[in-house]
Amino acid sequence: MNISKAKLLLLPPPLTPKLNRSLYSHSQRRTRSLPHHRDKPINWNSTHSFVLHNPLLSLLEKCKLLLHLKQIQAQMIINGLILDPFASSRLIAFCALSESRYLDYSVKILKGIENPNIFSWNVTIRGFSESENPKESFLLYKQMLRHGCCESRPDHFTYPVLFKVCADLRLSSLGHMILGHVLKLRLELVSHVHNASIHMFASCGDMENARKVFDESPVRDLVSWNCLINGYKKIGEAEKAIYVYKLMESEGVKPDDVTMIGLVSSCSMLGDLNRGKEFYEYVKENGLRMTIPLVNALMDMFSKCGDIHEARRIFDNLEKRTIVSWTTMISGYARCGLLDVSRKLFDDMEEKDVVLWNAMIGGSVQAKRGQDALALFQEMQTSNTKPDEITMIHCLSACSQLGALDVGIWIHRYIEKYSLSLNVALGTSLVDMYAKCGNISEALSVFHGIQTRNSLTYTAIIGGLALHGDASTAISYFNEMIDAGIAPDEITFIGLLSACCHGGMIQTGRDYFSQMKSRFNLNPQLKHYSIMVDLLGRAGLLEEADRLMESMPMEADAAVWGALLFGCRMHGNVELGEKAAKKLLELDPSDSGIYVLLDGMYGEANMWEDAKRARRMMNERGVEKIPGCSSIEVNGIVCEFIVRDKSRPESEKIYDRLHCLGRHMRSSLSVLFSEYEITNN
């Protein structure tokens, strides 16, 4: 850089009093080390004491304002210090990585230097990678490549930063291109570059390429194995994660706490308590660090695998409990149905953030206690904790459970009012809520408003249309889903087959059931078989339903046998119905519904003695019919009514009104029948 030009471009602004005093005090102490070189500046190198101990560089650490920074830069230009690579890179590093982060200005300085070194490029790229606009780091990388100077050639510090940005933004294809540059520069043998590329692919869910890079590299270390294990865990391939660990063991690589987090979390996904205990024993026997993330993973594993007492023991022994620790225990108790214990822990927390509220609300939804979930949501609002997307999803699920349409509409308005992004997850929850609460037209409206749809979105609308008996429209959305290149899953087919069942579309149902395996490589589960048996049973094709059950690769459960019994009662097939009832009573002799169906089937076949026997068997076994429960939403409050319930204070008035309504209905029906007879005579 030409110094005279630099002085014209950036004359030093007047020094602020504070900075002026600092410069003066430094210059008094180092009068010999700060000569003026306005005419012939020395090309200082980084070993020269003038550079290493220059007061201008030490003042950088005290900068709080861009104005101060510019004053120091101006003095560096005047004194020739800016020409030293070490000094200029220190200035750029401060701009890019300091707390204040003057990123745009760091680029200006970088471009003003004739041959910036690789350190200057790397710190600026890193600064942008940690900013609100990390994609800018790729543009800077392209500029660095165009610069073409051998001093600014990318090195083994450049690529881990770029791979991390690709990982954070899920840019697998761009990461693949950058990997090509790494191979060209022969940097793949540097372990931290190699590991960063594996981590990038794993973070993007691209385990095929992650495994390929891993297999082809001669520099595997513990970090490489951990990237692979945790990558498989992240995409739900828990068995593969454990398999990779076994390979790691066979190569003599010892695990650490990060390895164990991946393995313990994999056991949580599989519900494998025994293997989880084995890994826990390994941690204790080999003295691995019990880090907070590992302890939280162990608590989560024990609670999800049904050993909530061991999870609580670990929790109670924790010296320092994080918000994640509390959330894990609260979620664990809620998952086990121990909502009262969960609530006590929740109340013990002094400071509750949105994650903790979400754990409590989500636990209530999971335990099918929708009213409690919505009550918690109201408490959350009074506590001035701002709900997030997860809160809304949990609350919409609660509305779906209760059929609370008014509350669901209020939540929808809340989302719109506070401009929460209607992404796939939130949009899908709204579609599901409207469909299950009876407003299919609004469900369709929300569906069409979602810009990017996935299999869950289509599954929600297909299931909703099936629930409303609109089989043909459900099938049309399934076809649209396939045309869009979105693969259906097992839950999609539950909605699709249910639509065929409600619409009486027997052959279409057969075809889709067959296509599950032949076209989409999906294995039908018990739920799919129960829907098919229901479809065939309702159509009177009971022998075909029986043959389908015999061909099942697994034992039929109560839902499958129940569907067959219902069809037998509907069409009067007593022999096959008795076979189904016998199996059902073996599975659960306390289920009152079996006796009721059996009694009804015998009654419709005029087999009164057998009907009496079914009722007598029910009484002898002490089985009582579970009373039905209905709910109604009034002014946003969901009220539940149980059959023959007289616990309410106004029960007498309620039953009087019901009797009155019953009389009116009977008299209205009598009038209708009389008019019908007159018309037809």
Curated annotation (Swiss-Prot):
Transit peptide: 1-32
BP-aspect Gene Ontology terms: RNA modification
Entries under Pfam families matching the protein: E_motif, PPR, PPR_1, PPR_2
Keywords from the named record: Mitochondrion, Repeat, Transit peptide
Disulphide bonds in the chain: none
Region (Type E motif): 560-635
InterPro entries xref list: E_motif (IPR046848), Pentatricopeptide_rpt (IPR002885), PPR_At4g14850-like_plant (IPR046960), TPR-like_helical_dom_sf (IPR011990)
Region described as Type E(+) motif: 636-666
Source organism superkingdom: Eukaryota
GO CC, alphabetical: mitochondrion
A GO molecular function held by the record: RNA binding
Start-end of each PPR repeat: 117-151, 155-189, 190-220, 221-255, 256-290, 291-321, 322-356, 357-387, 388-422, 423-453, 454-488, 489-519, 525-555
Subcellular location: Mitochondrion
Family indicated by similarity: Belongs to the PPR family. PCMP-E subfamily.
Protein name: Pentatricopeptide repeat-containing protein At2g22410, mitochondrial
Gene from which this protein is expressed: PCMP-E28
